Amino acid sequence: MKEGWHKASIMSSAHKGGAPVDFADGTSESGDIQVLGKQLWRILPYIKPYWKRFALGITSNMGARICDLLPFVAMGLLTDAVLSGEIGQLKEFAFYGLLILGSFTGLAIFQGISNYSWETLAQYLQHDIRMAAFESLIKMEIRYFEDRQTGDIMSVISADVNQLENFLSDASTSMIRIVITFSTAFAILVWMSWKLALILFVPIIFIMPLIYFFSTRVQKKYRESRQSFGDINAVLSNNISGMGVVQAYNAETYEATRVGKESSSYKDHAIGATVQRTKFLPGIYVIAGIAFGLLATAGGYLMLEGPSQGGITPGQFVTFLLMSTRMSMPLFILGMLVNQIQKSEASARRVFAMIDLEPSIIDREGAESLEEPANAITFDDVHFAYPNGNKVLNGVSFELNRNQSIGIVGPTGAGKSTIVKLLLRYYETDGGAISMNGSDINELTLGSIRDQIGYVSQDVYLFHGTIRENIAYADQNAGDAAIVEAAKLAGADEFIQEAPNGYDTIVGDRGVKLSGGQRQRISLARAILRRPPLLILDEATSAVDTRTEEIIQRNLNQFKDGRMTVAVAHRLSTIRDADQILVLVEGVVVENGAHDELIAQDGVYADLWAVQTGELDKTTGEATRHDG
């Protein structure tokens, strides 16, 4: 991994000790307006790996600015030479002409090198910053993503990072150009007349307070604007992903209104920033005009006095006027530049807030890797409640060993899928313990735990790409034979072979081109390909027909040899052959045993079985079976 991507290398010590920050608005808990560019300064450590390119950009920019100002000096010298009668022949004029031509040639060369250096540097930096943000994001626990809108997260990694790229390739080079131009021109003017040079401090005295005044007002507007942009992305993401539902319910007008509301909010915040900017720019023009007028007036007076009285020559006056026009341009640019800096500061605040994220579920100090394949799972009096306070598990206990399978059933909300999430350490228990091979999973590394598991979620997710790529996601090095074998075990090979391009058929975003049952079977094939010691099936075949499910179950019975299997199901036929079946009601294991044992107990499980097999009317509770 590249050095620039390491979070540790870019977290400022000041931030580490500060208040918590969320990229959603990028503000500290106090809500104070930060100093201009405070977040943008955090880009500097990312430049370190590319310091040679950075140095080349600086030096070439300096060369370009010197070449840009040199013709003004030449014109002043030429003016004095002509007025004093020192030159009068064409070849002497040609010298100054060639000097000016050489200056413009040098300007073209140096400026080209500078542009290339800065724009390529911007690309390297935006890549490293984007990767740092993403690498920080993917370490966050599942709860983090459940609490946030996908569109807003995406806007940080895409739009906000792109805004920083624009800053790096445009605004930052403009700032450097302003500094170099102003300092070089100032040095030349001091050399000619320190009295006139002092006049240059007049605009600086007034511009700096104006910049601070503007930044404190516009920064909040741009921060709100970036958040509104994230909200637009979130609504659009929901609409596009759920377009089938939108159209099925004739909700196009309703959704257009929702998008319009968020877009209008973004528009209002952007206009608010524009209003502040339009108040700021005229002040810059006025100050620059005053400075130019003072230079012209004072310069004319000193020229009339002449060098003998401490004044300047006509040529020096010409140079002063030309220089002052060149120096006034940076002041005009500065007005627009401060606006761009504020936009970039708002984006940087969101990007670095994401980079600063710290997951709550991590490898504990001294955590050990699970070296041997998992062969025993134990839940010992496990309690768990979600952050909203909803208590889901109340003292759940069970054991699962190699070559065994366990089925988990119960009404919706009983805590079945929560057991799966705890096994994957998406969450941590509030009480009790979960162990794997006799070790508390909290004392094992996350990676070694998840390496043991092949997981099929009830919310099947397929990536945009081919069927082959989606199955091979579990093992990037798997060959075609292994992929096909996994698909056969999952009952997917038959429909894949009938697809237009077989295993190279594109499934679409989230597998939208496939049926629910087809998506489930590809997800199951993905888990099988991993050949995990622990197979977790969370409603893995709920969308397939009964015949296909029977085929899959037969195949899985062979695959389960030497493994542990946890199956969550509403369809009891799925887990009928499990060695152990847990019946959960309101987070409590009310029944535990094999299928025949639970039927004999004539309890909750027996009632569920009777309803599903048609032996009990689920609406009246009356028996429907008939003797004889």
Question: Locations of the language-model features?
Answer:
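Short cytosolic helices in intracellular loops of multi-pass membrane proteins
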Residues: 9, 15-19, 124-143, 149-158, ...
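Juxtamembrane loop-to-helix connectors within ABC transporter transmembrane domains
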Residues: 29-30, 39, 47, 114, ...
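Alpha-helical segments in transporter systems
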Residues: 41, 52-73, 77, 96, ...
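An intracellular "coupling" helix at the cytosolic face of ABC transporter transmembrane type-1 domains
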Residues: 44, 142-143, 159-168, 172, ...
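Transmembrane helices of ABC transporter permease
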Residues: 53-63, 173-224, 295-312, 329
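Transmembrane helix-loop-helix hairpins at lipid-water interfaces of multipass membrane proteins
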Residues: 54-110, 117, 190-195, 297, ...
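Helix-loop-helix
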Residues: 86-95, 188-202, 272-349, 354-355
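ABC-type nucleotide-binding domain
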Residues: 356, 363-364, 370-628
